Curated annotation (Swiss-Prot):
Comment, domains: The GATA-type Zn-finger domain is required for binding DNA and interacting with Bfc. Isoform 2 differs from isoform 1 in that it has an additional zinc finger domain. It is unknown if both zinc fingers are required for DNA binding or interaction with Bfc.
Organism lineage: Eukaryota, Metazoa, Ecdysozoa, Arthropoda, Hexapoda
Protein transport is among the record's keywords: no
KO phenotype (gene knockout): Reduced levels of phagocytic receptor crq/croquemort in macrophages during embryogenesis stage 13.
Signal peptide annotation: none
GO MF: DNA binding; DNA-binding transcription activator activity, RNA polymerase II-specific; DNA-binding transcription factor activity; DNA-binding transcription factor activity, RNA polymerase II-specific; RNA polymerase II cis-regulatory region sequence-specific DNA binding; sequence-specific DNA binding; transcription cis-regulatory region binding; transcription coactivator binding
Subcellular location: Nucleus
Functional description taken from the UniProt entry: May function as a transcriptional activator protein and may play a key role in the organogenesis of the fat body. Binds a sequence element (5'-[TA]GATAA-3') found in the larval promoters of all known alcohol dehydrogenase (ADH) genes. Acts as a homeotic gene downstream of the terminal gap gene HKB to promote morphogenesis and differentiation of anterior and posterior midgut.
Residue segments, region Disordered: 1-25, 161-200, 234-253, 405-463, 523-585, 599-627, 841-867, 899-1048, 1181-1202
Compositionally skewed regions (Low complexity) per UniProt: 161-171, 422-438, 447-459, 523-554, 565-585, 599-614, 909-950, 985-1007, 1024-1048, 1185-1200
Keyword Ribonucleoprotein carried by entry: no
Gene of this entry: srp
Protein name (Swiss-Prot/TrEMBL): Box A-binding factor
Composition bias, Polar residues: 189-198, 1008-1023
Length: 1264
């Protein structure tokens, strides 16, 4: 259809032939790649320059031949090129002939022939250049098929009426989705055609005679076939119209027959054997919908499948199941009868849903019980794809075509729809039914897995595909038809069928298929099964809405498909409601479906995965529909309960398939979405995020042109999966001890953002990814811990195990003796040590455990304090050396911060944070160092602590998680860019700010400048204020030694930061934020000055610097995030504040940065650890921030009141006033804190640095 449509358009333009010829070159180029195309173009140009004369002569010859040959001759001439492009061009030329006068047609045909020759030459050149022998072979195979089908399409277009044109478009689509895509690509290079004309002329001269003869014969055959097909389509169209009319009547009848049909719809469980038999019969008979006189030979099942690759195959698959209850199976394909059956099935579904609710409930229960693997389940899904759904799907099946085909068909439909909406809908129904007949058996065989996962009807394929792995296996999924494999990915069918199949439940398969049907015919009969009454209304709706939807679907087809998929997906009420055809209705129905399938969210595929439950984070608009789709499937989710296992096993690997399918399927508007949705259903999380991304892209309007690879690539999905579960694809349910749920959810978002960079979900996904990545980092640690713990728990409580030696059933670890018998840990170790079985007399009732000193003991605290102080000193020294470039280094170092160092630096500040809020500032400051050291050590050891500081910005945001969290995250993203992407992309300042804020979690003064810079939200400012106070304390503690320098630095920093704060506040646009920033600035300045002073003081210790210079380079760089110890934090703060100062204030950069001259930039590898730490850091920060928030709120209330009082119209004034007041307050506090903490800090620093330096240095190195 694409071929036909675009050629038609070009023919209408009069340059269709040339454009097509160019397009041919484009196609070839597209196949070969830009380089290949360029090489081919160069070759073509050379040949063209050499053969312009020849080309002119050849053009005349081709023109004469074409003119003489007539449309078929032209087609043959184009085919003579020997390339699909030639056929396409010829097809275009034929269309041009149809559209234009005989003479223009002849000229166009001649041009087309020339272009075809050129294109063939170009394609050959490209092929030779690209060495795409395989592609050329494929192209040749496609060329013959495409030439035939294209010629047929062209002939059809020439011969057929508008409806015939639609049929022709379908025929063109049938030719080859790749060919269609090729045509789409081919339409774009007149220049290329011209360039390749000489080559084409040569090629034509070489191939034209043979090709012309062959193509003439082929065209004659194709023309006959096309005519037959068109006549069949027309007949089918008329039949379809009659069927639709009859079906409407029948729907009413079906409503009456609902009880009878209900067994078809929902009681298939009881009639599963019959349904399976019918489905099997349908599957065995590719032309189960054989009423269409449509000759399959003319359009291979692949063509048919291609024609309606996504919806039809799914529909067919469902039809296979439906054939069970459609009576003639594929009755839909049968046309009126099938429609009647569909209506009956829909009525039955509706009756079941309404009057026969017990049946539905029973079916649902059975489905849930049978875990969607039994026939009943497939039957359920059969119901989902009830006949009416099938009808709807058929109507939408044109949309089910590959995205391009779908798009083109949609455009074609739009053109023809306006003229022949109903007719073409019917015609498409017929064609789709026909194709569904073949596809029915194809998909049926394959789709059996999809539609009849449980259903024996498709059981031959499904039985083999019974396992998720098989179902998801690319071969089986794409096995729908080998011809369709590549296309299959493009076809939603593959994704939905296979995804559905993957759900092992034909239930899910049918649900997904039904959803996709619904998705593809969002308005049509998605709910038909479940809503017979809705079906009747919606058939009218369908016809009405199908017309609208064919228009809308062209616009919103993908989106609606998504919505419809979501609702269709639901076996019951979701599908019913979803039947409403309007896109809005689809959305509402999706919501209603979610509501109706109350278990949709609750079922959550039984995975508890946010993805499953509502297609986790599917995003709004169509994406929610997606989610609903999954969750209508969710309705089946319980049925999928076993699928949980499958998901665990196949979810991840299936995700890539799903992604691939989705990506290719996405190309097919709803198909891709449906595939994603189905995949989502199958994968629960990943597919959903990917599908959501696809849906979001679709919602963005890219759906029409959703590039499968654009949103979901196998690598992207794998990356997302890896990010989600720490790369453990087979354990998607990552063992996130603390943030597993969030990590997973965020990971889902992350996957979404990864999958669909351009999708609507990306923004949310980005933040989700930021937290998700952090969560993942934390999760990976948690996973290991939890896995180890789970192993131990399972080992100690392994049911049925008893020691073969002492017969105990309780042990900390099960071992095996040389005989392989299980023995308890004691016996195993005893034997291992003594080589003698452990005497039973040694058996004890209790398990002897080594007495380990509990973590957090005073000794450890002192050690950690020493280490922290040493690290801080070393870091300060290294920062002194490293801080000069910290502005830049910190950016990279932020990203580069070592995971270990990060936890140290970040966690220490954060841990100190935790203690800070608890204690008064002086006490907090005093204890902060201790806490910094202690907590830092604990934080370093604790992934959460590690994550906490990293996410100190997040923590801030978490502190004010209500709105500030988002604001802060945004702020952090803008200023700090918490999101991994943002962090990576963050400017040095932002990076520094981010790190500073993170280190600020320990030492917030640097963070405060960052906050000041970032301070998008007052919350952030509040946090910064508290952080600044804390930082002031920390810095006072660390920098009291250098209080004078700190004061000087603070002055400089204050001035700069005030300016920065003013600008930041102006940026933040919130005077309160600005004032808060101003307030924060003094603290941050003080902190920065203190950090600078601390860095200067730390610089004194060259050894520490030398040791930590590298570590601190990373640490200081990571310093914002990674201050290892309070001292390290201080030095990090100094470096960070310096770096902030530097990057924020270059003038002060010199003054303050003299303290910190980074010797080397930290490697970027810290970025990932930083992100990894973020989840844990968020937790730590959230806890700390909750405390800090209280302090900050108090400070903010005081400061904010002062600021508010002192606020002036000028942000600068606000900043200055706030900064001045804040600075004064902070200075006073700092002085007090310094007085109180100076001694302690100096002592701690001295003690830590002095006696701990050697040990700590080693420790720091080790920690690093």
């Amino acid at each position: 259809m694409t071929k036909t449509t675009k050629p038609k358009e070009k023919a209408a333009a009069g340059g269709a032939v040339i454009g097509s010829g160019s397009g041919l070159g484009s196609v070839t180029k597209a196949g070969g790649g830009s380089l290949l195309s360029n090489a081919a173009d160069s070759k073509i140009r050379t040949a063209k320059s050499n053969n312009n004369k020849r080309q002119a002569g050849r053009a005349a010859t081709a023109l004469a031949a074409t003119t003489t040959a007539s449309a078929l001759a032209a087609t043959t001439t184009a085919g003579a090129t020997g390339s699909n492009a030639a056929a396409n061009e010829t097809e275009i030329a034929i269309e041009t002939e149809n559209g234009e006068a005989a003479t223009p047609t002849a000229a166009a045909t001649a041009a087309a022939a020339n272009l075809s020759s050129l294109e063939s030459a170009r394609s050959q050149a490209l092929t030779s250049v690209v060495s795409e022998t395989a592609r050329q072979a494929v192209t040749t195979a496609n060329a013959s098929a495409t030439s035939t089908s294209t010629v047929t399409a062209a002939t059809e277009i020439a011969t057929a009426t508008a409806s015939d044109t639609a049929a022709t478009s379908e025929a063109a689509i049938d030719d080859d989705p790749s060919a269609i895509n090729t045509n789409n690509n081919n339409n774009n290079s007149k220049a290329q055609n011209d360039a390749s004309e000489s080559v084409k002329t040569k090629v034509i001269s070489y191939h034209q005679s043979e090709d012309q003869q062959q193509q003439q014969q082929q065209q004659a055959q194709i023309y006959e076939q096309q005519q037959q097909f068109l006549s069949q389509q027309l007949i089918s169209h008329h039949q379809q119209e009659q069927h639709q009319q009859a079906q409407q009547q029948q729907h009413q009848q079906v409503v009456q027959e609902q009880h009878q049909a209900s067994w078809l719809a929902y009681d298939l469980t009881s009639g599963s054997a019959a349904a399976a038999a019918a489905a099997a019969a349908a599957a065995s008979h590719p032309h189960l919908f054989g009423q269409f006189s449509y000759p399959p030979s003319h359009h291979t099942p692949t063509q048919l499948y291609e024609h309606y690759p996504s919806t039809d195959p799914i529909m067919r698959n469902n039809f296979a199941f439906y054939s069970v209850y459609t009576g003639g199976g594929g009755g839909v394909g049968v046309g009126m009868t099938s429609h009647e059956h569909l209506a009956a099935a829909a009525a039955a579904a509706a009756a079941v849903a309404q009057g026969t609710t017990p049946n539905i409930d029973e079916v649902i229960q059975d489905t849930l019980k049978d875990e969607c693997f039994e026939d009943g389940h497939s039957t359920d899904y059969h119901v989902l794809t009830s006949v009416s759904d099938m009808h709807t799907l058929k109507d939408s099946s044109p949309y089910a075509l590959t995205h391009e085909q779908l798009h083109q068909q949609q455009h074609h439909h739009q053109q023809q729809l306006h003229h022949h909406q109903q007719q073409q809908q019917q015609l498409y129904h017929q064609q789709q039914q026909q194709q569904q007949q073949q596809q029915h058996h194809h998909h049926h065989n394959n789709s059996t897995s999809s539609a009849g996962g449980d259903s024996p009807s498709s059981s031959h394929a499904l039985s083999t595909l019974q396992s998720f792995t098989q179902l998801t296996s690319a071969t089986q999924r794409d096995s729908l038809s080998p011809e369709n494999d590549a296309y299959f990915a493009a076809a939603q069918l593959g994704s939905s069928l296979q995804n559905s199949s993957v759900y092992a439940g034909s239930l899910l398969t049918q649900t997904a298929n039904g959803i996709q049907y619904g998705m593809q015919s969002p308005n049509q009969t998605q709910a038909h099964l479940q809503q017979q009454h809705h079906q009747q209304q919606q058939q009218q709706h369908q016809q009405h809405q199908q017309q609208q939807l064919q228009q809308q679907q062209q616009q919103h087809h993908h989106n609606q498909h998504q919505h419809h998929n979501s609702s269709s997906s639901s076996p019951g009420p979701a599908g019913l409601h979803h039947s409403s055809s309007s896109a809005a209705t689809a959305a509402a129905v999706a919501a209603a479906t979610a509501a109706v399938n109350g278990h949709n969210s609750s079922l959550e595929d039984g995975y508890g995965s946010p993805r499953s439950s509502h297609s986790g984070g599917g995003g709004g608009g169509t994406l929610p529909a997606f989610q609903r789709i999954a969750y209508p499937n969710s309705g089946s989710v319980e049925r999928y309960a076993p699928i949980t296992n499958y998901r665990g096993q196949n979810d991840t690997w299936f995700d890539p398939l799903s992604y691939a399918t989705s990506s290719s399927g996405q190309a097919q508007l709803g198909v891709g979405v449906g595939a994603g949705v189905v995949s989502n259903v199958i994968r629960n999380g990943r597919a959903i995020s990917a599908a959501n991304a696809a849906a979001a892209a679709a919602a963005d309007g890219t759906t029409g042109r959703v590039d499968p690879g654009t949103f979901l690539s196998a690598s992207a999905s794998l990356s997302a999966m890896a990010a989600e579960s720490g790369g453990d694809f087979y354990k998607p349910n990552s063992f996130n001890v603390g943030g597993g749920g969030r990590s997973k959810a965020n990971t889902s978002g992350a996957a979404s953002s990864y999958s669909c960079p351009g999708s609507n979900a990306t923004s949310a996904a980005t933040s989700a990814v930021a937290s998700g990545t952090a969560a993942t980092a934390a999760t990976t640690l948690d996973e290991h811990v939890s896995r180890a713990n789970s192993r131990r728990l399972s080992a100690s409580k392994r049911a049925g195990l008893s020691c073969s030696n002492c017969h105990t059933t309780h042990t900390s670890l099960w071992r095996r003796n040389p005989a392989g018998e299980p023995v308890c840990n004691a016996c195993g170790l005893y034997y291992k040590l003594h080589s003698v079985p452990r005497p039973l007399t040694m058996k004890k009732d209790t398990i002897q455990k080594r007495k380990r000193k509990p973590k957090g003991t005073k000794s450890e605290k002192s050690k950690s304090k020493s280490k922290n102080a040493l690290n801080a000193i070393m870091e300060s020294g290294s920062l002194v050396t490293n801080c000069h470039n910290v502005g830049v280094v910190l950016d990279s170092s932020q990203m580069d911060v070592n995971d270990d160092m990060k936890p140290q630096l970040d966690l220490k500040p954060y841990n100190s944070y935790s203690s800070q809020p608890q204690q008064q500032l002086p006490q907090y400051q005093q204890q902060q160092q201790l806490l910094m050291a202690d907590q830092h050590s604990s934080a370093a050891s604790s992934p959460h602590s590690m994550g906490s500081t990293s996410l100190s910005p997040s923590a801030m945001s978490h502190q004010h998680q209500t709105h500030p969290h988002q604001q802060q995250q945004q702020q952090l993203c803008s200023g700090l860019d918490m999101s991994p992407n943002s962090n990576y992309q963050m400017s040095p300042l932002n990076m520094q700010q981010h790190q500073q804020q993170q280190s600020c979690s320990m030492q917030h003064s640097p963070s405060t400048p960052t906050s000041i810079f970032n301070t998008p939200s007052p919350t952030h400012q509040l946090h910064n204020n508290n952080n600044n106070n804390n930082n002031s304390s920390i810095f006072n503690n660390n920098n009291n030694n250098n209080s004078s320098s700190n004061e000087n630095n603070n002055k400089l920093i204050q001035k700069y930061l005030q300016a920065q704060q003013l600008s930041s506040s102006s940026n933040s646009g919130s005077t309160s934020d600005h004032q808060l920033l101003a307030q924060l600035l003094p603290n941050s300045i003080t902190a920065a000055a203190a950090a600078a002073a601390a860095a200067a003081a730390a610089a004194i210790k060259t050894e520490a610097l030398s040791l930590t210079s590298q570590a601190n380079c990373s640490t200081a760089s990571a310093g914002l995030m990674v201050t290892s110890t309070p001292t390290t934090a201080s030095s990090t703060l100094s470096s960070l504040s310096h770096s902030n100062i530097i990057s924020l204030q270059n003038p002060y950069h010199q003054a303050g940065m003299t303290l910190c001259k980074p010797t080397r930039p930290s490697p970027p590898y810290y970025l990932t650890p930083e992100e990894d730490e973020q989840p844990a850091l968020i937790k730590m920060e959230e806890m700390d921030q909750s405390q800090q928030q209280q302090q900050q709120q108090q400070h903010q209330q005081q400061q904010h009141g002062e600021i508010m009082l002192s606020r002036s119209a000028s942000l600068d004034e606000h900043y200055e006033l706030a900064a001045f007041q804040r600075h004064q307050q902070q200075q006073q506090q700092l002085q007090q804190q310094t007085a109180a903490l100076l001694g302690q800090h100096e002592q701690h620093v001295t003690n830590y640095a002095m006696h701990k330096f050697g040990v700590d240095r080693e420790t720091v190195v080790k920690m690093e």
